[in-house]
């Protein structure tokens, strides 16, 4: 049985919320950044990230699923040819929400939601180097503990051999 999503529903009915999120996602992919209320930005973030993940896969099935939500073919084309490949090596976190203060008319909290830039080759190399350094440090700690244990056992063996020679 379908259950409503958690949190307050935007715009009243479920159908209105669905259309509102589709239009916000359409504007986000068209312009790269949009200014909206914090509540709408928080609801839009997982919705838009799911669409970008479908665009990263790039197959016909995912394209048709996105076309059910975003009916503008030119924006879907942009999503699949430019935005999806841009985040090919990023495992998530394609959007950023920045709070910008309250709206003048009704004092509603506002935010900017934008598509983050793709990781550059240098950033990817830096991330891989940091991961390798952490792995090396972890391996060094593990091997140091093993070598200390070996040293302790060899000392015990030497002492046992010395005692046996005294007894004999």
Swiss-Prot record:
Source species of the chain: Streptomyces coelicolor (strain ATCC BAA-471 / A3(2) / M145)
One MF annotation (Gene Ontology) recorded for this entry: structural constituent of ribosome
InterPro entries: Ribosomal_bL17, Ribosomal_bL17_CS, Ribosomal_bL17_sf
Name the UniProt record assigns to this protein: Large ribosomal subunit protein bL17
Ranges of Basic and acidic residues composition bias in the record: 131-168
Record-stated family: Belongs to the bacterial ribosomal protein bL17 family.
Top-level taxon of origin: Bacteria
Annotated Pfam families: Ribosomal_L17
Protein keywords: Ribonucleoprotein, Ribosomal protein
PANTHER family for this protein: LARGE RIBOSOMAL SUBUNIT PROTEIN BL17M, RIBOSOMAL PROTEIN L17
Disordered: annotated span: 124-168
Annotated coiled-coil segments of the chain: none
Gene it is expressed from: rplQ
Keyword Ribosomal protein among record annotations: yes
Gene Ontology cellular component list: cytosolic large ribosomal subunit
Assembly information from the UniProt record: Part of the 50S ribosomal subunit. Contacts protein L32.
GO BP terms in the entry: translation
């Amino acid at each position: 049985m379908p259950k409503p999503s958690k949190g307050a529903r935007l715009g009243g009915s479920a159908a209105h919320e669905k259309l509102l999120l589709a239009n916000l996602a359409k504007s986000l992919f068209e312009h790269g950044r949009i200014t909206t209320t914090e509540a709408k930005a928080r609801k839009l973030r997982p919705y838009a990230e799911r669409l970008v993940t479908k665009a990263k896969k790039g197959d016909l099935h995912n394209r048709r699923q996105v076309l059910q939500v975003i009916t503008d073919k030119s924006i879907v084309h942009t999503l699949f040819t430019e935005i999806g490949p841009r985040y090919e090596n990023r495992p998530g976190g394609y959007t950023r929400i920045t709070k910008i203060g309250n709206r003048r008319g009704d004092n509603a909290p506002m935010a900017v939601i934008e598509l983050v830039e793709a990781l550059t080759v240098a950033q990817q190399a830096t991330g891989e180097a940091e991961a390798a350094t952490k792995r090396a440090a972890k391996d060094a700690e593990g091997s140091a503990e093993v070598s200390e244990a070996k040293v302790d056992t060899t000392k015990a063996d030497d002492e046992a051999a010395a005692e046996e020679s005294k007894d004999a």
